[in-house]
């Protein structure tokens, strides 16, 4: 069963961290963060990451649940996420910036690391509902 280690973008931003720093997850693990802000999820085969987070009782951001907005956007830092058809992200955002939508995304590796709540990034702001 794939495991997704996650970190809330708001925590990264509030602490002035660089989410692309190799040790950003180490820094998060050294803090006393709520489970919703940092931790790991096991995601069942065919389950979307957002669904797995909700099954744990987490209130991660979303709106459309159909890949038509950027509310549930996450940045993949390790591993990969396979998305169903999405209509909102550019090829550059998917291929170069590693943006994925957790509402239609499932892990495509045994271990994945993401920064969720990435809707706050400047280049995604105009697609948040």
From Swiss-Prot:
Keyword flag Transport: yes
Binding site for [2Fe-2S] cluster: 64, 69, 72, 103
PROSITE patterns to which the protein is assigned, alphabetical: 2FE2S_FER_1, 2FE2S_FER_2
Domain 2Fe-2S ferredoxin-type intervals: 29-120
Free-text comment on the cofactor: Binds 1 [2Fe-2S] cluster.
Cofactor(s) required for function per UniProt: [2Fe-2S] cluster
Molecular function terms, GO-annotated: 2 iron, 2 sulfur cluster binding; metal ion binding
InterPro entries, per database record: 2Fe-2S_ferredoxin-like_sf (IPR036010), 2Fe-2S_ferredoxin-type (IPR001041), 2Fe2S_fd_BS (IPR006058), 2Fe2S_Ferredoxin (IPR053441), Beta-grasp_dom_sf (IPR012675)
Pfam families named among the record's database cross-references: Fer2
Family: Belongs to the 2Fe2S plant-type ferredoxin family.
Role this protein plays: Ferredoxins are iron-sulfur proteins that transfer electrons in a wide variety of metabolic reactions.
Name listed for the protein in its UniProt record: Ferredoxin-1
Taxonomic placement: Archaea, Methanobacteriati, Methanobacteriota, Stenosarchaea group, Halobacteria
């Amino acid at each position: 069963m794939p495991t997704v280690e996650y970190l809330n973008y708001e925590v990264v931003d509030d602490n002035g961290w660089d989410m692309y720093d190799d040790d950003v997850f180490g820094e998060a693990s050294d803090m006393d963060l709520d489970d919703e802000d940092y931790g790991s999820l096991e995601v069942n085969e065919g389950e979307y990451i957002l669904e797995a987070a909700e099954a744990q009782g987490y209130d991660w951001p979303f709106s459309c649940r159909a890949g038509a907005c950027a509310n549930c956007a996450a940045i993949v830092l390790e591993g990969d996420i396979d998305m169903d058809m999405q209509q909102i992200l550019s090829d550059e955002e998917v291929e170069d910036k590693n943006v994925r939508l957790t509402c239609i995304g499932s892990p495509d590796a045994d271990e994945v690391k993401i920064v969720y709540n990435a809707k706050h990034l400047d280049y995604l702001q105009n697609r948040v509902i």
